[in-house]
UniProtKB/Swiss-Prot annotation:
Gene3D superfamilies: Winged helix-like DNA-binding domain superfamily/Winged helix DNA-binding domain
Domain of life: Bacteria
Protein name: UPF0502 protein Shewana3_1622
Lineage: Bacteria, Pseudomonadati, Pseudomonadota, Gammaproteobacteria, Alteromonadales
Family statement drawn from the similarity comment of this UniProt entry: Belongs to the UPF0502 family.
Amino acid sequence: MELTLHEARVIGCLLEKEVTTPEQYPLSLNALTLACNQKTSRDPVLDLSEAQVQDALDSLNKKRLISEQSGFGSRVVKYKHRFCNTEFSELQLSSAAVAIVCLLLLRGPQTPGELRTRSNRLHDFKDVLEVEACIKQLMERDKPVLAQLPREPGKRECRYTELFSQGAEQISAASFTSADAHPLNEQDRQQLEARVTQLEEQVAELKDKLDSLIASLS
C-alpha cells in the first residue's frame, strides 16, 4: 500500500471522524474537504479543493480503500474507508493501533509522548508505556506498519512514522541517511561527555543545597 499525501490525509480523516463523530460518518465530499483542511491537528496544514479531494477519493476507490454510500432519498454521496477492520480489509487493528496510525497519517512523525497527548479523543491510553507497547506490536507485524526514526539532536524520545504513505517513506530514508552521514567524531564525543559530567555535578550541588535548606527549615 502506497498513499500520496492527499490520499493519506483522506484516509486519516475518515479514520478520525469514524471514531470522534460517528453520527456524521460516513462523510460527504464537503465534510471530508473541511476535515482535510483543518487548521488544528494537521501537519502539514493543507488547502485542498473539493476537486483535489475527489481525485484522491477516485484513486483510493481504485485501490479498494474507500467505498461510496448514498442514503435512501438522498443524492449526496458519502464516503467511508475500507483501510482496516472491515470485511474487505486485510489490515485488522485494535482501537489503540487505529489511533496511532490515524495520528501519524494526519500529523506525520511523532514521539510516544506526543501520540499519547494527542490521542485522547481516539483512544484512552493509560500512559506512555501503553503507547510504546502498541508501537512495538505494530513494528513487529509480519508486514510492519511503523518505523522508528533516529533520535533528533537534543531530543529524549525517538519519533515514529507510518509506512503507508510516500512522504513517510521519504522521511524515514532521509532521517537514516542524515544520521549515518553525521556520526560523532572523537572530539565531539569527549566534549559531550564533559558537558554531561559538568551538568551532573551541577545537579548534585543543587541537590546538596536543597537538602541543606530543607534541614534548616525543619
